[in-house]
């Protein structure tokens, strides 16, 4: 339930979203100005099963609009080429929850799959992206006694997006072809990884009606735009452009 602000949660695993603007406990660290806390779903003595499907097919979307240059003599009259771009998204999940030991040990488990596809076409090249990475979530609640609770929260949300880039084939005269609208000559392919793993173990002891003891340990492994294979040395250098401008400067 805590420390999840650094990890993407499957939507169907969220029970509540809380906004705290003050008076929150030390488990939220030294944050200032308020926090957003996610409360995950948990199991109970009742069995529950369910699932969801979110589908955004390519044929259900309007085509993008091209943006044209005002200069009719421009080599590429299209400023932004969008009309052939396509995208589709499919996210599906299934969950189950219930008692492992009645009145004492409960679970909530969820698995989520996805199939997201995008085709982007530019003036001189194109790119295809796909994401089919599964994700999972597990919550265990163990009431050791009526006054002692042990909770485990586990999350796997690593996401791999595959990229394929292409050039448009040249004409018979070796000239560039613009706005072809299909993938032709492969250039490279690579993956971008985001997310990772999260594990939280929390103990809560209700000592008296006015005194509660809580202890928590968490582990988080999170990647941000990690590329495989890695970029070659020097790729982090900035781009440099040279324009044929006429100036009054004489070398």
Report residues per predicted region:
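Transmembrane beta-barrel wall of Gram-negative outer-membrane proteins
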Residues: 48, 82-161, 190-213
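Short acidic, glycine/proline-rich loop/turn micro-motifs
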Residues: 2-3, 61-67, 76, 119-124, ...
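Short acidic/polar hinge/loop motifs at secondary-structure boundaries
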Residues: 1-21, 64-87
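Glycine-rich, phosphate-binding/catalytic loops in enzymes
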Residues: 34, 68, 233
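A beta-strand signature from Gram-negative outer-membrane beta-barrel systems
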Residues: 6-54, 91-103
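Transmembrane beta-strands of outer-membrane beta-barrel pores
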Residues: 23, 53-59, 102, 113-117, ...
């Amino acid at each position: 339930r805590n420390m999840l602000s650094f990890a993407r949660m499957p939507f169907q695993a969220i029970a509540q979203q809380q906004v705290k603007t003050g008076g929150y406990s030390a488990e939220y660290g030294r944050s200032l100005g308020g926090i957003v806390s996610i409360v995950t779903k948990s199991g109970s003595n009742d069995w529950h099963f369910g699932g969801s499907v979110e589908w955004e097919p390519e044929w259900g979307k309007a085509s993008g609009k091209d943006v044209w240059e005002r200069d009719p003599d421009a080599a590429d009259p299209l400023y932004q080429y969008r009309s052939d771009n396509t995208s589709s998204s499919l996210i599906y999940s299934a969950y189950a929850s219930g008692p492992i030991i009645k009145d004492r040990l409960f679970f909530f488990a969820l698995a989520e799959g996805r199939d997201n596809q995008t085709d982007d076409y530019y003036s001189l090249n194109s790119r295809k992206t796909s994401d089919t990475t599964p994700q999972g979530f597990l919550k265990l609640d163990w009431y050791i006694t009526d006054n002692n609770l042990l909770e485990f929260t586990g999350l796997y949300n690593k996401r791999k997006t595959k990229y394929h880039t292409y050039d448009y084939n040249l004409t018979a005269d070796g000239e560039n072809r613009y706005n072809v609208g299909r993938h032709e000559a492969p250039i490279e392919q690579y993956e971008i990884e985001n997310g990772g793993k999260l594990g939280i173990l929390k103990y809560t002891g209700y000592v008296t009606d006015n005194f509660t003891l809580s202890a928590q340990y968490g582990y988080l492994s999170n990647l941000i735009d990690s590329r495989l294979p890695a970029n070659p040395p020097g790729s982090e250098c900035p781009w440099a452009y040279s324009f044929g401008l006429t100036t009054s400067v004489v070398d």
